[in-house]
């Protein structure tokens, strides 16, 4: 069996995910998304008309054959926990399949909140060891992408690595937000710097840097040993990017895995898709791209479905109002339970149970679930948070000064509207 595994990639693709456990780091606050994450963790933020951001990492695990998953939570975890309990409870424990929720909790040493990404795993080592996995896949729960982790596991084993880091080129002006690495001809990582002020460029491309995606594969025993050493290091910040990966790099045990090798794409000629929707503009832009004629991310790929909690909702409905005006939409995503009455929706994303009343014009907007838009409103280049009631005649996205005074307006001109902001303006939020 061992000999067959070494020579047969198909056998490796089947066996390695079974021998692995995935740990999804889902405790991030996502402060750059402003008020959108005041009451929910970033992985629980809505995306793409019906999903949550964490659904992408979870779906990648399932589609890759990894059915032992731990989700490490911390900040504002209730919404996230509720979503996973409702939408991801189909695993068969008798077949050793599960999604374990691992919240931050008081332990013997007195820690409560996780001190860093590595500490989030360290504090749960007693539970993780019980999984008896040979490989541990560490994932961020707040990125949008499709990846076959079994291909990364194969790469890890074939290179004889103790740690493998997924990477991709990014524009050098954006590289300061990532861990940046240099590799040799065998893709061994020879240098790793976390979020450098002056990121080094790639040898063959001075305009780009080779960035870590925060996706790691470890030999399990090696990871546990590293984490125990790091836990006892008073000078450590207990973070994978700042402490663990540089230490492994110095030991010559870390290898890079180019993301294009495992990125799942319907069109092999397209650019590999991976987004950190950590700012309001990036979030708005990534949502609206899904409504374009040919989106960069294919959500209709039946061979790599993105799963989520599916509510029992009626179909979306477009109706005439009493004046005879038709509800119309163009280049938009409109989810179940929506009703558009005598209004026009263009290049927008409407999540479930959104109601747009008569004489409205919605353009380049993202409306989260249960938003109610009163008559004669104009909404443009905005994100409307869940269950907001937009009063009759309100105009958003046309006057920069007024938008900044009433709501949050980003430097790029994207407006975020929440229930609390509307209440401060004197608008009731109960229908």
Curated annotation (Swiss-Prot):
Chain residues that bind beta-D-fructose 1,6-bisphosphate: 39, 419-423, 429-431
The record places the site described as Could play a key role in the communication between the regulatory and the substrate sites at: 74, 113
Q: Does the keyword Ribosomal protein apply?
A: no
Q: Which sites bind AMP?
A: 40, 46, 52, 130, 370, 386
InterPro entries recorded: ADP-Glc_PPase (IPR011831), ADP_Glu_pyroP_CS (IPR005836), GlgC_bac (IPR023049), GlmU/GlgC-like_hexapep (IPR056818), NTP_transferase_dom (IPR005835), Nucleotide-diphossugar_trans (IPR029044), Trimer_LpxA-like_sf (IPR011004)
- The record's top EC class is transferase
Activity modulation: Allosterically activated by fructose-1,6-bisphosphate (F16BP) and inhibited by AMP.
Q: Which Pfam families match?
A: Hexapep_GlmU, NTP_transferase
Asked if the keyword ATP-binding belongs to this entry, the reply reads yes
Q: In which pathway does it act?
A: Glycan biosynthesis; glycogen biosynthesis
Keyword annotations from UniProtKB, A to Z: Allosteric enzyme, ATP-binding, Carbohydrate metabolism, Glycogen biosynthesis, Glycogen metabolism, Nucleotide-binding, Nucleotidyltransferase, Transferase
Q: Name one GO biological process term.
A: glycogen biosynthetic process
Q: Where does alpha-D-glucose 1-phosphate bind?
A: 114, 179, 194-195, 212
Q: What does this protein do?
A: Involved in the biosynthesis of ADP-glucose, a building block required for the elongation reactions to produce glycogen. Catalyzes the reaction between ATP and alpha-D-glucose 1-phosphate (G1P) to produce pyrophosphate and ADP-Glc.
Query: Which protein family is named in the record?
Result: Belongs to the bacterial/plant glucose-1-phosphate adenylyltransferase family.
Concerning PANTHER family, the annotation shows:
GLUCOSE-1-PHOSPHATE ADENYLYLTRANSFERASE (PTHR43523:SF2), GLUCOSE-1-PHOSPHATE ADENYLYLTRANSFERASE-RELATED (PTHR43523)
| Complex and partners | Homotetramer.
Q: What is this protein's name?
A: Glucose-1-phosphate adenylyltransferase
Natural source organism: Escherichia fergusonii (strain ATCC 35469 / DSM 13698 / CCUG 18766 / IAM 14443 / JCM 21226 / LMG 7866 / NBRC 102419 / NCTC 12128 / CDC 0568-73)
Record gene name: glgC
């Amino acid at each position: 069996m061992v000999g067959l595994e070494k020579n047969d990639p198909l056998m490796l693709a089947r066996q390695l995910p079974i021998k692995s456990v995935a740990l999804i780091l889902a405790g991030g606050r996502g402060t750059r998304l402003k008020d959108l994450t005041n009451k929910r963790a970033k992985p629980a933020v809505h995306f793409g008309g019906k999903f949550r951001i964490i659904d992408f990492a979870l779906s990648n695990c399932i589609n890759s054959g990894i059915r032992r998953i731990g989700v490490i939570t911390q900040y504002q975890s209730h919404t996230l926990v509720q979503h996973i309990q409702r939408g991801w409870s189909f695993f068969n424990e008798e077949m050793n399949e599960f999604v374990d929720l691992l919240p931050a909790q008081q332990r013997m040493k007195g820690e409560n909140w996780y001190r860093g990404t590595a500490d989030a795993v360290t504090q749960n080592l007693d539970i993780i060891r019980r999984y008896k996995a040979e490989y541990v896949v560490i994932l961020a729960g707040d990125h949008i992408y499709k990846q076959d982790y079994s291909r990364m596991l194969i790469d890890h084993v074939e290179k004889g690595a103790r740690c493998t880091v997924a990477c991709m080129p990014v524009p050098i002006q954006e590289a300061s937000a990532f861990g940046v690495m240099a590799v040799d001809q065998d893709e061994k990582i020879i240098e790793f710097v976390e979020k450098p002020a002056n990121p080094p460029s790639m040898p063959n491309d001075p305009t780009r840097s080779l960035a870590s995606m925060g996706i790691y594969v470890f030999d399990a025993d090696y990871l546990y040993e590293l984490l125990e050493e790091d836990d006892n290091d008073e000078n450590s910040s207990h973070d994978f990017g700042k402490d663990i990966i540089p230490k492994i790099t110095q030991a010559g045990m870390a290898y890079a895995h180019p993301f294009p090798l495992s990125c799942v794409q319907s069109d092999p000629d397209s650019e590999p898709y991976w987004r950190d929707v950590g700012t309001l503009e990036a979030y708005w832009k990534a949502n609206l791209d899904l409504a374009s004629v040919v989106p960069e991310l294919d959500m209709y790929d039946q061979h790599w479905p993105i799963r989520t909690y599916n509510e029992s909702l009626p179909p979306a409905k477009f109706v005439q109002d009493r004046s005879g005006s038709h509800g119309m939409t163009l280049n938009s995503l409109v989810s179940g339970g929506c009703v558009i009455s005598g209004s026009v929706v263009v290049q927008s994303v409407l999540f479930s149970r959104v109601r747009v009343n008569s004489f409205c014009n919605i353009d380049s907007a993202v409306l989260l679930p249960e938003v109610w838009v009163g008559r004669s409103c104009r909404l443009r280049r905005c994100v409307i948070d869940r269950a907001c009631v937009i009063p009759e005649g309100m105009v958003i996205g046309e006057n920069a000064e007024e938008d900044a005074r009433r709501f949050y307006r980003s430097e790029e001109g994207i407006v975020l509207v929440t229930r609390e902001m509307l209440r401060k303006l004197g608008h009731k939020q109960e229908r």
